[in-house]
Amino acid sequence: MASFRQSALALTATLSLAYAWLPSTTPLRGVNLGGQFIVEPWMMESEWSTMGCSGQADEWSCVQSLGQDKADAAFQSHWGRWITQSDFEDMHNYGLNTVRIPTGYWMKEDLVKDGEYFPRGGLEYLLKVCGWAADQGIYVILEQHAAPGAQANSNSFTGHSTTAGFYTSENYDRGVEYVAWLANLTYNHNEMRTVGTIGVLNEPLNWDNKVSTLVTDFYPAAYKAIRAVEPSGGNPLHIQFMGSKWGSGSPESSLPSGYTDVSFEDHRYLKWDTSVSVTQDEYIQTSCTSDRTAAGEDPTYVTEWSLSPPDDVESTDGWSKGSQKEFYGNWFAAQVQGFEKSAKGWTFWTWKSTLGDYRWSYQGAVTAGVAPKDLDSLASSTVCG
């Protein structure tokens, strides 16, 4: 890969210099490690059952049900088996250069208040996973996917499927402390030598008046806190915000004057975009031509997308994952070409699931022949004309 931004991280004297790079001329091509540090039961029910959490809505309810010690053991077993070193070898062999790792604020265990229920012991496994990525030369985005109080309503990706309660000064402070802690880890652990981006918050509420303080208070505080832990003279981490296309306001509007090394993320799931006609031709056309970078938000990366159509058609003949592999291969190519043209690259949601459905699994899509083992081969695809 050519023309990387190469950042020499200032590590302790006992650690080797590490290099975190951000693809520039070569697109970011990657996957999410969904389900690793934040379990979403809908996409991994058999694993959830193995953990003893069957019937529970989220991590909070599972920990509360099992009790802390039993839950800690169950989650630590999960963290040790869901993503393994061989997964990163496969990613590298498939031409992927990036992983986005969703994490919850409870990984910094002193942020968890009495009456909150989350598993303990995750940091050891996060370091291990980042080390495996680094061994394969894979760039890492660390994301605050689940924030204190939950940033979205009734969604397991927040760790607690409840009414969004993140939008308070107290929880903003905890969220800021968490992303600063993540940033500090990257300078003090050799395993994190290819971590180059901190995502400050996944999928906040959109089109809601609560988010005004997200933009005016939380975003600038998070930016300043991350910059404050960076060593002087070192190249800075990229700090990533949900772009304005998400609908939570303009993230850069309240950042400090002269802010640097900021990137933006877009999530693009056509299955939930009711403005797009549900036809194969329209899905291909839209994927080829949709501009995913808002004005003033360069670079933007499409950090979540899939091959899943709307729920009401996904099992019909015209959208069957069994009989329509040719279409799904073309749609995969169209999205890749579109995201690499209108943005700076992408990370697919997700690497693996237990759904038995390659439309939600990059690993499964490669096995099914829908995603190629050589991504460069898509350059010759004529799907977008």
Outline where the language-model segments fall.
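An active-site-proximal structural segment forming one wall of the substrate-binding cleft
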Residues: A73-V99, K113-A146, F157-T197, A225
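Active-site-adjacent substrate/metal-binding segments within catalytic domains
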Residues: V39-R120, W346
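Extracellular glycoside hydrolase catalytic/binding regions
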Residues: N190, T197, L201-E340
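Aromatic-rich peripheral "rim/lid" segments of glycoside hydrolase catalytic domains that contact
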Residues: G318-G322, F327-A334, G338-G385
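N-terminal module-boundary/linker segments of secreted carbohydrate-active enzymes
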Residues: S16-P41
